[in-house]
Design a protein with these regions (language model features):
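Transmembrane-helix signature of 12-pass secondary carriers
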Residues: 1-479
Length: 479
């Protein structure tokens, strides 16, 4: 098949009609592990923040702890943009092997850091791998999961970030306990966890096929049909389906080898500008909200509640549990009640709860335990909200630019909300001012409420709809 041929394909509709199966669980586990790895890395950065200020480790200042977190996020931005374009150009499968390899190398090297600059560079490399993973994996998962359950599955996968967070927190209880492992050595062992998990992920991904939707667009529809036929046979056996192909929706496209930059620009800035604004706001607000608290929670507990650094990890466990349960228990509502209503509710409620908690903190009415309980309740809601931001940007743009769109809005949101937040809050905590920290929490809360208002205004009701119905492929124009 040559570039520019017009074809009609049942591939998207056949993927969407498949019943849930063990094959889909393989997709979820092997690709969704990205969020576990990111949760692990962010948690280690938070838990190690206090330890790395000690003279027998790297002797960092609180500001440099925040700066190292910023380097991780900046690396994630560059990785997302670079690998996001590569994912749309060269395929989902090629890139999700490259990105996890970059992550593995970065996190392994982090264990051998000898000063601030080496640590910052290795954290940036680790972030580049994770950022690339977000673009490659989000696009692949959405294109392989049936439309009727895409919302709950995406939220569940994004929520697994907190499985990694819990794993990191539990590990630090042992690795940062000087009675078990010397302080100068324990933090280095912590980074070995991520490298080990990365090797396991590479092993499982060997069985994941290229996205049939990507193959279809790039003139390889015969390969796409073969993959879908194999999956159908694996899942359905000889039973077949109750619906014949002739009754399914046909996707009509003109094949292409790549999407030019001017077409990417036109689609994002002009054709889908309202959706672009929505994605920008949702990603920015949740990134600031999360990173403001998560990259600095260890410093808050140690400075304002006098929690010993080796005990910080234990305070994260209930926090992580609330974050895991939120998407698990609320996820199905995004497919039944609908995207627009649920995103509006979760964003708005998360902002209101943080403002109330900040007021209690400012009034001196919280202890380390009640502060953690409040965070747990807030992020039960906020975790579903943040996960829905990734769900939104991964499904409301055309197939040809899906990974790039994810990368762009992840990058914008992370730069504006994620990179700035740790620096700002690290500096605030360094001043020791409770009032300044309270005002920072109010800013984060206001941003989440802004996200809720924006979703209510221009949100896209994408629940239970094929990706091709939510956003028609660019290659279908004029057909």
């Amino acid at each position: 098949m040559t570039n520019g041929d017009t074809i009609e394909s049942y591939v998207p509709a056949r993927l969407d009609r498949l019943p849930w199966s063990s094959w889909h669980w393989l997709i979820v586990v092997s690709l969704g592990a990205t969020w576990i790895l990111d949760g692990l890395e962010v948690t280690l950065a938070g838990a190690l923040g206090g330890v790395l200020t000690l003279p027998d480790t790297l002797g960092l200042t609180p500001a440099r702890v925040g700066a190292s977190a910023t380097c991780y996020l900046a690396g994630a931005v560059v990785g997302a943009l670079l690998f996001g374009y590569g994912t749309d150009r060269f395929g989902r499968k090629k890139l999700f092997f490259i990105t996890v390899a970059v992550y593995l190398i970065g996190t392994a090297l982090s264990a051998f850091s000898w000063n601030f600059w080496s640590y910052a560079i290795f954290r940036a490399l680790t972030g580049a791998g994770i950022g690339g993973e977000y673009a490659a994996i989000n696009s692949a998962i959405d294109e392989l999961i049936p439309a009727r359950v895409r919302g709950r599955v995406d939220l569940m996968i994004n929520g697994s970030y907190w499985v990694g967070a819990a794993l990191g927190a539990a590990a630090t209880l042992v690795l940062l306990d000087p009675r078990r492992i010397p302080t100068w050595l324990g933090w280095r062992f912590a980074f070995g966890i991520g490298a080990t998990l990365g090797l396991i992920v590479i092993f499982f991904r060997r069985w994941i096929p290229e996205s049939p939707r990507w193959l279809m667009i790039h003139g390889r529809n015969a390969e796409a049909e073969e993959i879908v036929a194999y999956v159908e046979k694996k899942i359905l056996g000889t039973r077949g389906t109750a619906v014949s192909d002739s009754e399914l929706f046909r996707t009509r496209i003109r094949t292409r080898t790549h999407t030019p930059w001017h077409e990417i620009w036109d689609a994002i800035v002009h054709e889908h500008r309202r959706r672009s604004f929505l994605g920008f706001v949702l990603m920015l607000t949740q990134a600031f909200f999360y990173n403001a608290i998560f990259f600095t929670y260890a410093l808050v507990l140690m400075r304002f509640y006098n929690v010993p650094e080796q005990n910080v990890g234990s305070y994260l466990l209930p926090f992580a549990l609330g974050n895991v349960l939120g998407p698990l228990l609320l996820g199905h509502l995004f497919d039944t009640v609908g995207r627009k209503k649920m995103i509006t509710i979760t964003y708005g409620l998360a902002g209101i709860l943080l403002a109330l908690t900040g007021s209690l903190f400012h009034a001196g009415l919280l202890t380390a335990q009640t502060q953690t309980l409040a965070w747990t309740i807030i992020f039960f809601i906020a975790s579903a909200a943040a996960s829905s931001a990734y769900l939104t940007v991964s499904e409301i743009f055309p197939l040809e630019i899906r990974a790039m769109a994810i990368a762009i809005f992840y990058a914008i949101g992370t730069l504006a909300g994620g990179v700035g937040a740790p620096l700002l809050f690290g500096w605030i905590i360094g001043t020791g001012s409770i009032t300044a920290l309270f005002l920072g929490y109010l800013v984060a809360a206001a941003l989440m409420i802004l996200g809720a208002v924006t979703e209510a205004w221009i949100g896209v009701p994408a629940e239970r709809q094929s990706l091709e119905h939510v956003a028609a492929p660019l290659s279908s124009k004029g057909l």
